[in-house]
């Protein structure tokens, strides 16, 4: 059985949070840079470029910018990066 990833998702992306939870991932709401620690991957809106400092090296995983992507596309990117 595949181990599911711990995914940080920006607060406003509730549809993405729900979709990832349905896939079995552990979803953490990103309210600050500290919330991103320990996440395998983070999904941010891309609206406020690097407002929380998440685009830098504060996490070991990749950062996915949701801007312009559908929920399904975001979930596919999460799957390919975790």
From Swiss-Prot:
Protein's name in the database: UPF0180 protein BC_1394
The species this protein was found in: Bacillus cereus (strain ATCC 14579 / DSM 31 / CCUG 7414 / JCM 2152 / NBRC 15305 / NCIMB 9373 / NCTC 2599 / NRRL B-3711)
Pfam families per the UniProt record, alphabetical: UPF0180
Highest taxon listed in the record's lineage: Bacteria
Intrachain S-S bonds: none
Family named by the database record: Belongs to the UPF0180 family.
Record-linked HAMAP family: UPF0180
